[in-house]
Structures are given as structure tokens and as C-alpha cells.
Amino acid sequence: MTGREQITIVRHVPLSVLNKRIKHPKGLPEVVPRLVFIRLRYKGMSVVDAAEAVGVSHQTGYNWQKRWNEEGPGGLVP
């Protein structure tokens, strides 16, 4: 993991709910990488490392986290 994380992740839902939504995306498969990113953040991975793990730019990771923190799961729907 890189450096110290400055942005905290808001835990809108329990980890078990994230896991369920990843496994059963309900017709929104494009949300799965975003949910995986959030799950990695829940587990303590930095934004940069989590973004790299799901194959997106660091800026996209910061954008996803901002939307998640402000809007919850609905913020990840494109």
C-alpha cells in the first residue's frame, strides 16, 4: 500500500452487502468494478492501490470514492 490515506471511506453499507452486490449485480454489470474498488477501500487499501487493482486511473478512483461518500451506492451507477 502506498503512503497514508487522507480520504476516509464512508461505510454506507456493511461489507456483506457489498459482497452480495458484487456477486449478483442485478442487471448493472458495469457497477461491479466500482463496487470491488469500494470493497478494497473498506479493507484498508489506498485509493491509488485500489484503482490500480481494478484497472482504472487514480483520478477515476478518487471520483468513485467522492461519489460513494456523497451519494452512497447510487453514486456508482453511471
Residue spans of the language-model regions?
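Short, basic alpha-helical/linker "hinge" immediately adjacent to a nucleic-acid-recognition surface
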Residues: 1-32, 38-78
